[in-house]
Amino acid sequence: MNKLKILLHVILFTILTVSVVFAAENGFKAKLTGNDEVPSVKTKAKGEIKFKLSNDGKELSFKLHVKNIKNATAAHIHSGAYGKSGPPLANLFTGPKKEGKFSGDLAEGTITAKDLSGDLMGKTLDDLVQFIKSGETYVNVHTDANPNGEIRGQLK
């Protein structure tokens, strides 16, 4: 009976470990703040974005949640290491502009290969995923007051 209990614990531990590893490999996120913008921006706004890759690797779903953002105009995934700016690779939010102060889900959707732009135009979604895993991508939210970006976070 004790051997069976131990075996069940080992199996359960293995399943949980594999599930956590699988989730980490198929999910990406970032915390967005003004301090991470280049140059940094003094703002009370902040945000969080979460991505999940489909099992077949053809869709990357996302949800972008923000707090205290004012007059948000756009949000993108950009290429660029921490502290460096780069061009957009995919649109996350393109309007209509959120007038006034806003807290809530700014954007939610799915990215596929046809949504890629800039250096990744015509490439596969796996190319974007590899770029994210390399640490060379960030998300930022643009506003009227800060058209180059008010809050930013490096994807991990």
Q: At which residue positions do the language-model features occur?
A:
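Bacterial N-terminal signal peptides that target proteins for export
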Residues: 1-11
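Bacterial N-terminal signal peptides
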Residues: 9-19
